[in-house]
Design a protein with these regions (language model features):
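Intrinsically disordered, low-complexity Ser/Thr/Pro/Gly-rich regulatory segments
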Residues: 1-116
Length: 116
């Protein structure tokens, strides 16, 4: 876990969210997991569900696009099945990539980018 993930985890926990971090999802038959979701948090009071994927990498945008697409798709597929199965599957999931820079981009894998 990076220091960025730790700060995000602490922030959402402090705000009263139920937070899961570094959660492996999609157990594979031959062993291992399909993906790991970095931060998934739910606030009972306002019913806000958020999936955050922080990254401080220096990969190309095409590589990042591929990686974030896989993580966000896995989030939509598994959050209601494996992480918070007691939530209604029709609830909206806010998905955000947290990066150190974004250039002129506003989205990655169709989701919002926030820079630190």
């Amino acid at each position: 876990m990076s220091h960025l993930e730790e700060l995000i985890y602490q922030y959402y926990e402090w705000k009263g969210y139920v937070v899961r971090r570094n959660t492996k999802v999609g157990r594979l038959r031959h062993g291992g997991w399909e993906c790991e979701l970095d931060i998934v948090a739910f606030n009972h009071q306002d019913r806000h569900l958020i999936h955050l994927e922080p990254s401080i990498d220096a990969h190309s945008w095409s590589k990042r696009e591929e990686r974030f697409k896989k993580k966000f798709e896995a989030g939509r597929k598994y959050i209601f099945k494996e992480i918070f199965p007691w939530l209604s599957s029709d609830m909206e999931i806010e998905q955000i990539a947290i990066l150190i820079s974004k250039g002129t981009r506003e989205l990655i894998a169709g989701r919002k980018i926030i820079i630190i």
